[in-house]
Amino acid sequence: QRWLLAPEPVDQGFDRWFPLAPTWPERLQALGAAGIQRLVLLGGAQLSADLLQADCVDALQLTLVPQLLGGRFSWLPCTNAPLPAALAQPGAWQSEGVEDLGDGEWLVRYRRIRSG
């Protein structure tokens, strides 16, 4: 099924529409109430930054490739909005494994450690 989280519904292409709540915690709570237990974010610098700024990210899967990209290719936008200090604290993330994807590319998994 294809579900849409947006300010307004669209005429076609989606099986279900969720109104865009004011904050990410509220949006994720609405999705959870609908039975969504896991959401995968595949990209979008601003979306990634918004979810990190709201401290709504529970896991990271990063690929390391022997190629440096920056500027418009960065996965987080260059803004003045800081990320929560808790994300940079020792013990905020725990390594869950590394996988060799071949051709010098690695997938590194981290899980967010939350207190309480």
Task: Name each model feature, range by range.
Residues 1-116:
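Enzymes that bind and transform nitrogen-containing heteroaromatic metabolites
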